[in-house]
């Protein structure tokens, strides 16, 4: 059966980190890398965490779902992630031959029996050299994904559905769409590479 969704510091942090990274990528692809690098990412993360906390509290009737020390711990982990991201960004996201198709790209696909598939794709990038699309799902994780998480069909099937329905919605052949997770670890360890 389906469980009831409850907000937590993990969802608040994940949403906030998504918003900051997506803003960075939007500026990077639509303007310049230099402008993206000049963004005050640390302040943006703090602002998004506070905003998302306030919104969750409004929506849940004021029920406290995380403590101040959790917010501080996650924010400090976020600072390390942003530092890592700025250093390693070029390994994962390049402007040379790539264009940003969209951020939070909506999918609204009609299925049989009056069922709709509705979702949002975190990032879509077009490779103009190879004429290919890349659907990227940003995941925040406490310690990264082990082989079991990588093999979890619930996780991988989501991206396969995005690929299927995005391709169908935009008349793009499936063999021209790649899917990829961009996993950012909340807990970083010395001498451990991503």
Could you say what each language-model-derived stretch is?
Residues 1, 15-26, 164:
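Short, hydrophobic/amphipathic alpha-helical patches that form generic packing surfaces
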Residues 20-103:
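A non-catalytic, helix-rich entry segment at domain boundaries
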Residues 98-194:
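Mg2+/Mn2+-dependent nuclease catalytic core
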Residues 9, 13, 17, 74, ...:
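Hydrophobic (often cysteine-bearing) scaffold residues that line and stabilize catalytic clefts
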Residues 2, 24-33, 168-173:
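Short helix-capping/linker segments at secondary-structure and domain boundaries
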Residues 6, 67, 92, 112-113:
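Residues embedded in well-ordered secondary-structure elements
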Residues 1-11:
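C-terminal, charged and often intrinsically disordered regions of DNA end-processing helicases
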